[in-house]
Structures are given as structure tokens and as C-alpha cells.
Design a protein with these regions (language model features):
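A generic alpha-helix structural signal
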Residues: 1-4, 23, 83, 96-97
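Short, conserved secondary-structure transition motifs
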Residues: 14-32
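Glycine-rich, small/acidic residue-mixed loop/short-helix segments
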Residues: 12-14, 37-114
Length: 116
């Protein structure tokens, strides 16, 4: 680490990879999405071609909710955490899947599923 001082290199933990994942918007199965989410909710809809012929799950994908979306959030005064409710005009519109303090932004960041 002595050699890295000129480059402002510091030690860190594996937790820093989680922060970078959130900053980059890289999803983690089991944290940001699970078997109850559909590809459209978590930003993977561009990989689904509903105009193709038959494929397993197509009928279900034609009827799923496309009004919930995963968004990155930046919080001014708090560090968000999993399950944090998101309000708009006193109504719950979503919840946070993951959160952390971002040294890059100097603020709390997270990913949230929000009903639009």
C-alpha cells in the first residue's frame, strides 16, 4: 500500500463491490429481482421479442404488468435500505431493493422498483 499512496489507493472490503454494482446499475438476482419479477420490470424487456413465434412463457409475458420499473435513486439525507417504501403524494408507489452510501456521489444511493 505504500507504493499506492501517490495514486490515492486505499484498502477496502468486498462491500465496495456492492456499492459499485449499485452505481453501475448491475442487477443481482435475489436482491434486485427474483422469480416474481418479469423482465419488463427490471429493465430486461429489450431482450424479449414478443413478435416471435411461440416460446415458453410468451402467453404470460403478453399479460404481465409493465407499469413497474426499476430505477436508480440518489437520496439527499438518508442511506436507503432494502424494503424502504417510496412515497409520492402520500401514496406508496414502490420500494427499494438495495441501498448503500456512495463515496462517488457522497450520498445514499439505491435501486427501487417503482409503480409508474
Amino acid at each position: 500500500m505504500e507504493r499506492g499512496k501517490d495514486f490515492n489507493i486505499k484498502t477496502s472490503s468486498l462491500d465496495s463491490m456492492g456499492i459499485r454494482r449499485i452505481e453501475a446499475g448491475i442487477l443481482d438476482y435475489g436482491t434486485d429481482m427474483n422469480r416474481f419479477n418479469n423482465p419488463f420490470e427490471v429493465g430486461l424487456g429489450k431482450f424479449i421479442d414478443l413478435s416471435k413465434g411461440f416460446f415458453i412463457g410468451k402467453d404470460k409475458l403478453l399479460t404481465v404488468n409493465k407499469k413497474t420499473k426499476l430505477f436508480g435513486i440518489i437520496c439527499q439525507n438518508i442511506i436507503p435500505f432494502s424494503g424502504l417504501k417510496i412515497f409520492y403524494k402520500n401514496k406508496i408507489v414502490g420500494q427499494t431493493t438495495v441501498g448503500a452510501f456512495s463515496p462517488y456521489f457522497g450520498k445514499g444511493i439505491g435501486l427501487s422498483l417503482i409503480h409508474i
